[in-house]
Regions:
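A beta-strand edge to alpha-helix "cap/lid" segment located at domain peripheries
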Residues: 2-4, 20, 38, 43-44, ...
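Generic alpha-helical structural signal
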Residues: 9, 13, 50-53, 57
């Protein structure tokens, strides 16, 4: 059973809100146990929620003022594509990223990043 587009959009927003609040538990709750993270058309960077969690635990520790601002979002089928402006808050230049979230049910099963 697939969720309506609006529900996927709401889940994507909830994980982004948790990311910006640096609430690791709330952020990770939106991802599947076997989540895959990869560069767009590139190598898989990490697999599984424990690896995902460890990665973002480090990001939150290293960049306590990190924020991602949503510039645009589209929903296509079971995919939510976010265009974000990311500012690490550490004096480094902000950057833009496209995050492509692929859903299985109400969980994000895969994330592909284009940067």
């Amino acid at each position: 059973m697939s969720l309506p587009d609006r529900s996927l959009e709401n889940i994507a927003q909830a994980q982004l809100d948790a990311y910006n609040a640096q609430d690791l538990d709330a952020h990770c709750a939106h991802f599947a146990d076997d989540v895959v993270v990869a560069g767009l058309n590139g190598d898989v960077a990490r697999t599984g929620i424990e690896a995902y969690r460890a990665s973002y635990e480090k990001v939150f520790a290293d960049f306590p003022n990190n924020k991602a601002k949503l510039l645009n979002r589209i929903v296509v089928g079971a995919n939510v594509i976010d265009h974000e402006h990311v500012d690490r808050g550490n004096g480094d230049a902000p950057f833009q990223v496209a995050a492509i979230y692929t859903f299985k049910g109400d969980k994000i099963a895969r994330v592909d990043f284009a940067r």
